[in-house]
């Protein structure tokens, strides 16, 4: 299949699965707002591996995965009907560890990045060493209090 058509089909399948969950067509209470990041479809369109994450702990993650696995048949027929596919893909849902790891790498990069000149010249007020900030000076000037600078 044409790679461009395959990419369009992948994004449309993810959109259809998300729509089914958001519109309440999936009745399983274990399925609660997962984020679908990518999908790998076989060339013959019979199999699709759907990668997802969600903001949850390990116990909730297991329940969410079980819920998605249990409604995979429904989602397959829902997607097949809406996209008018010749064969409905069999979905396999996989927790996306690579997405979580990429978020951690981004956080580490942000933490190790050098401070900007502005941050060096104007430290955070929480880290203030007793210096007065502009708001305090403004409040004092309005109330008539004079400070030594």
From Swiss-Prot:
It is found in: Cytoplasm. Keywords: Cytoplasm, Ribosome biogenesis. Residues 126-143 have a biased composition (Acidic residues). This is Ribosome-binding factor A. It comes from the Bacteria. One of its GO terms (biological process) is maturation of SSU-rRNA. InterPro entries: KH_dom-like_a/b, RbfA, RbfA_dom_sf. One of several proteins that assist in the late maturation steps of the functional core of the 30S ribosomal subunit. Associates with free 30S ribosomal subunits (but not with 30S subunits that are part of 70S ribosomes or polysomes). Required for efficient processing of 16S rRNA. May interact with the 5'-terminal helix region of 16S rRNA. One of its GO terms (cellular component) is cytosol. Belongs to the RbfA family. Residues 116-149 are annotated as: Disordered. Monomer. Binds 30S ribosomal subunits, but not 50S ribosomal subunits or 70S ribosomes. One of its GO terms (molecular function) is ribosomal small subunit binding. It comes from Leptospira biflexa serovar Patoc (strain Patoc 1 / ATCC 23582 / Paris). Pfam families: RBFA. Residues 116-125 have a biased composition (Basic and acidic residues).
